[in-house]
A protein has these predicted regions:
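SF2 helicase/translocase NTPase motor core
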Residues: 1-166, 240-249, 253-257, 264, ...
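Short glycine-/polar-rich loops that comprise or flank the Walker A/P-loop
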Residues: 61-62, 86-87, 140-141, 164-167, ...
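Structural recognition of the conserved hydrophobic beta-strand(s) that form the central parallel beta-sheet
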Residues: 119-122, 166-173, 344-346
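Residues immediately C-terminal
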Residues: 126, 144-151, 159, 176-177, ...
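Conserved RecA-like P-loop NTPase helicase motor core
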Residues: 152, 310-429
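Post-DEXD/H (motif II) to motif III coupling segment of the RecA-like Helicase ATP-binding lobe
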Residues: 154-213
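Short, flexible/disordered intra-domain loops and linkers
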Residues: 179-185, 293-301, 402-415
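Conserved interdomain linker/interface between the two RecA-like ATPase lobes of SF2 helicase motors
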Residues: 193-281, 285
């Protein structure tokens, strides 16, 4: 007699890669705790569900709880759970829609009249009283999985994680929280240390988990208004970095303000026009926008990009944002895959696990000095898809304006880490020599030739 439906069963059509097998062995060797640090697109979800299936076979696991940062990730997890014969309760939004069902199935599991329960929830629901009141009744044989686990290092979320559940697995391409060592430590203290192997982008490409790519840095200058704001913010960031009594959130707020300014730099629209004029025949293109607005016109970058592509260039596009409903997202994905839509103009969707593997070309207009966002945005474009042999990436890089000596030193230190990531990404590209030559200009300007 086979494993009953609703209980984790490894699918016959899935073959784990060697690094996934190694990660699973590492997690079991660490007594059922640990954080998987694996490149975006390398199969963290499948690895986690494989762990659940093995725990069911060896330990009699009773409950799987998956915590995701966003609603769309709940539905993506549900799709993968279906492949493992699981029937998850999707616990998010109104408690009326899921609370009584969780209570009922939890009672059945505890009374041994039901073998297994799967619950997929969001960070927002995790901290709610309705979910917390249920968590305390989850049995000892429960596995909690934190997807995009870096988010769970925030104080309120970390405090909401159940301490009585001892089987814990964190998933993140970059578990280190940006300018928040305390949050990173709390996160790894809860889920467990980063497990071997740490799978880099290069490893994932070599293993065939991600496709190869060509990389084209596109340099953009700030206009006069943006340059003044940039210099002022950089000066304040310098003060915040030197101050002993600074609050981490003060520095983060300044860095975010400057990132939004850079992300929405008005000259990026001209750069986009220049690139796309010769690419109007292409399809499967993602335009990844900042959520900021032009400092002079106050127009959101998303609107300016849609206007340029659709009205001016006649490129068939639609928007894909956090506000797009789940059903509308599915419709857009289908139109995008078929080529009916040539492009998607998006905000944030590359940052947290949105799965649109049909992307073959991407124009990244949003700028981020957050290492996690940098890795996620570029790694997600490299997901394999039938007929997709390689990807093409146009990456807009804003050139900092002329700054005074003191501010220049701050800028140089901040830029060094960011430029290191651009260089690493260029080095892995199929056109590495060409891409590195373009970046050399920036390295020379800032005296960073040692990168």
């Amino acid at each position: 007699m086979g494993i009953p439906w609703g209980c984790p069963q490894f699918p016959a059509d899935v073959q784990l890669r060697p690094y996934q097998e190694t990660a699973i062995r590492s997690w079991f060797a660490s007594n059922g705790r640990g954080t998987l640090k694996m490149a975006t697109g390398s199969g963290k979800t499948i690895t986690a569900l494989a762990i659940a299936a093995r725990l069911y076979e060896t330990l009699g696991l009773q409950v799987l709880v998956v915590v995701c940062p966003y609603r769309h990730l709940v539905t993506q997890w549900a799709r993968e759970c279906d492949r493992f014969h699981l029937m998850p309760i999707l616990a998010f939004e109104s408690a009326r829609q899921w609370q009584s069902e969780v209570t009922r199935q939890l009672y059945r599991v505890r009374s041994h009249s039901q073998r297994f329960l799967t619950v997929i929830t969001t960070n927002a629901t995790l901290i709610s009283e309705s979910f917390q009141s249920q968590l305390r009744y989850f049995p000892a044989k429960t596995l909690i999985v934190g997807d995009e686990a870096h988010n769970l290092g925030a104080p309120r979320l970390e405090a909401s994680l159940p301490r009585h559940i001892k089987l814990r697995l964190g998933l993140s391409a970059t578990p280190e929280r940006y300018f928040d060592e305390g949050g990173t430590d709390a996160l790894l203290d809860y889920f467990g240390a980063v497990l071997k192997p740490e799978l880099t982008l290069a490893d994932a490409i070599r293993a065939g988990a991600l496709v190869r790519y060509t990389y084209f840095p596109v340099f953009v200058n700030l206009n006069e208004t943006e340059s003044r704001h940039y210099a002022l913010l950089t000066h304040r960031i310098g003060w915040a970095l030197q101050s002993d009594d600074r609050e981490p959130e003060d520095l983060t707020a300044l860095l975010m303000r400057r990132a939004r300014l850079v992300g929405a730099a008005s000259n990026k629209i001209a750069a986009l026009r220049s690139v796309m004029r010769s690419r109007l025949h292409t399809s499967h293109t993602l335009f990844y926008c900042s959520d900021g607005t032009d400092t002079d016109t106050d127009e959101p970058q998303l609107s300016a990009v849609v206007r340029l592509l659709g009205s001016e260039l006649g490129y068939r596009v639609n928007t894909y944002t956090a506000e797009t409903s789940i059903s509308e997202r599915e419709r857009l994905r289908t139109q995008f895959e078929s080529g009916e839509l040539q492009g998607l103009v998006a905000i944030r969707c590359l940052d947290e696990g949105v799965d649109v593997p049909a992307i073959r070309t991407a124009m990244i207009l949003a700028s981020s000095r957050n290492p996690r966002q940098f890795v996620q945005r570029r790694g997600r474009i490299l997901r394999p898809h039938p007929g997709k042999e390689r990807a093409t990436l146009f990456d807009t890089i804003v050139l900092p304006p002329q700054l005074d000596r003191q501010t220049w030193d701050v800028e140089r230190n901040l830029l060094k880490k960011e430029l290191q990531r651009f260089v690493e990404f260029a080095d892995l590209a199929e056109n590495a020599a060409e891409a590195r030559l373009k970046l050399l200009k920036l390295q020379q300007r800032y005296g960073l030739l040692d990168i």
